[in-house]
Amino acid sequence: MFQEEIAKQLSVLTEIEANKILECIESTKNKDMADFAVPIPKLNKFKKLVGKPDQLAIDFASKIQLNDCIQGASATGNYLNFKVNRLLQVQEILKEVINQKEKYGMTEQGKGKKVIVEFSSPNIAKPFHAGHLRSTIIGNFMVNLFNELAYETVSMNYLGDWGKQYGLLAVGFEKYGSEEELLADPIKHLYNVYVQINGEAEKEEEAKKKYAEEIAAGVEPTAPLQTTPTIHDTARAYFKRMEDGDAEALAIWKRFRDLSIVKYKDIYNRLNVKFDIYAGESLVTEGMTIEFKKLQDKNLLEDSQGAKVIDLSKPNKLGKVLVQKTDGTTLYITRDIAAAVDRKNNIGFDKMYYVVASQQDFHFRQLFDILGKMDYQWQKDLTHINYGMVKGMSTRKGTVVFLEDILNKTQKKMLKIMKQNEQKFAEIEDPEKVADIVGLSAVVIQDFNAKRNKDYDFNWDRMLKSDGDTGPYLQYAHARLCSLERKSGFEFNPNANLSLLSEPEAFNLAITIGRYPEIIQLTHNQLEPSTLVGYLFELAHAVSSAHQVLWIKDREKDVAEARFVLYWAAKVILGSGLRILGLVPLERM
C-alpha cells in the first residue's frame, strides 16, 4: 500500500513504470529519519535521469503530494526519504498477515521453474560426520525456501558410492568384517573396517618405500620385498571388476550401499530432512561411456603416460585434469560429468545447485569448464554453493566425530537443562522428542549464525543457552508466544480494532514483522541462511521488548484483542522462518 503510493507518485515525476520503481524502494533501519527510501541512482537502470542524484532527490521531495499514506518527504544525499502514516502501516501489515497467514512474504516467483539441489552426499566408506552437517542443513534450507517460493524442487543425495575405496572396503570386510556389527550400525562398522584395512595398506606402502631407499643407499634391506599383490593392488583389481560389471563384486557393494542408506534415513529423519532421490556415482556408469566418447570426438582428451587428461590451462588457468587412469578406471570428475548430463536429460532443470564445501571450489570450476568445452549450453545454469569449515569438531585425539553422536550429545545436554524447571518439564508431552528438536535447533542456528562461506568454531556451551542469539532462544520465543495465546483468556479475532496499537513497541514489532517479505527476497537472492537467522533474532528481540509493556491479561477487551493479533502475527512469522531453516517450531518447552 505505502510502497505502491510512493511508486505511483514517483512514476509521474520520472516517467518510469511504477512496478519498476517498486524494486528500488528500501525499508530503512533508522525509523526516526524515515520509513522508506529510494536511492535515486538506482532509477537510472530504467531511465537515464537528467541531473545530479542529490539535486533530483531534493526536487522530487518538494513535489511529493502528502496524503493519508505519505506524511513527509525529504532528501538526504542521493536518497529520497519518506515518512508514512505509522498507525495505518501497522494495521496494513497485520491485515496482510491475517489474510495470508504462513504464506505472508512468499511469492510464486518460482512457478514453472525446476531446480535440483544436490546436498549432503556422504561417502559410504567414510564416516557420516560433523563435516556433512553444513551441506545437509544448508541444502535443506534451500529446498524449503524454493518450495515456499513455488519452484518445482528436486532434493538429491548424490552418494559417494563408487571408486577404488570400495575395492579397499570389500578387501577389508573379508578380513575384518562382522555380519552382526554390519547389521547393527553399517555406517560405523564399514568406517572401522576401512580404517583398519587402510592402516594395513599404508604399512605395506611404507615397507616398499623403505626397501627402495635401502637398496638405493646400498645397504642390506631390513625386510624382504613383498612379492604378492599389495592390498592397494587387490583393491584396484576389485574396483576394476565392479566397473566391468562383475556380478559377485557388485552384489557385495550393493549390500553395503543399501544398508548404509537405511541408516542414513534414520539420521536424516532426526535432522528433519527428506530426499526425493538417492543418486550416486555408481548410477552413471553407462553415461560415462557416452560422455567419454564425446570428449574423444571433440579432441579434448590427451594421453599422459597411458592415462587420459583434459587441458584446461587456457583460458582459465585450471590446469590439466585426469579423467581416466592407466588401468581404464574413472575418477570423481568423470562421474560428475556424466551425472550432470544424466540429470539434464532425464530429470531436467532450470538451475542445479551443488552444496559442497569450499575446498571443492577448484573441482567445480574444472567441471563447469569441461561441460562448457563439450558445448553444453546449460552449463551456465549450474552453481556451486560453497561453505566454510566447522572447527572444533574432532576429539582430543584428533579422531572424527560422528554426526549421530553430536545429535545424541545435544539431546542429552538439553534434557538435563530442561529438567531444571520441574514444573515446565512436567507439562511437556514427549520430553525426549522436544530435547532432540531443541538440540537440533542449537546445532543448526549456531551454524547459520555464521556467514555461509566462513569457517566457524563449534561451541557446545554457547549454542545450548536459552538466552543470547541461539537456537534454544528462538524456540523459547516461539513457545512463549504459544503459551501467551493459551493463557490469555482471549480468542483470536481477525476483526480486532488494530488502530489501538499505538505504542512505540507495537509499531516496532509490527514493522519488524512487515520486513519479512523483503528478508525472504534477500535470502533467496543470496541463498544465505544467516540473513534469515539474523532477522528472526531481531523479531524475537522485538517480541521480548513488547512483552515488557504490551500486556494482554487484565486489559480492556478491545486492547487485549488487538495485542493478541500482534503477538499471533509474530508467532506466524517466527514459525515460518524456523520451518524454512529446517526446524520444527515448538509450542511448549
From Swiss-Prot:
Keywords: Aminoacyl-tRNA synthetase, ATP-binding, Cytoplasm, Ligase, Nucleotide-binding, Protein biosynthesis
Residues that hold L-arginine according to the record: S121, P122, N123, H132, Y332, D336, Q360
Cross-referenced SMART domains: Arg_tRNA_synt_N, DALR_1
GO biological process, alphabetically ordered: arginyl-tRNA aminoacylation; mitochondrial translation
Xref: Pfam families: Arg_tRNA_synt_N, DALR_1, tRNA-synt_1d
Single Gene Ontology MF annotation: ATP binding
Transmembrane segments: none
UniProt motif ('HIGH' region) ranges: 121-132
Catalytic activity of the protein: tRNA(Arg) + L-arginine + ATP = L-arginyl-tRNA(Arg) + AMP + diphosphate
EC number assigned by the record: 6.1.1.19
Region (Interaction with tRNA): 469-483
Top enzyme class: ligase
Cellular localization per UniProt: Cytoplasm; Cytoplasm, Cytosol
Entry's Gene Ontology cellular component terms: cytosol; mitochondrion; phagocytic vesicle
Family statement: Belongs to the class-I aminoacyl-tRNA synthetase family.
HAMAP family given in the database record: Arg_tRNA_synth (MF_00123)
Function: Forms part of a macromolecular complex that catalyzes the attachment of specific amino acids to cognate tRNAs during protein synthesis.
Stated name of the protein: Probable arginine--tRNA ligase, cytoplasmic
Protein's gene: argS1
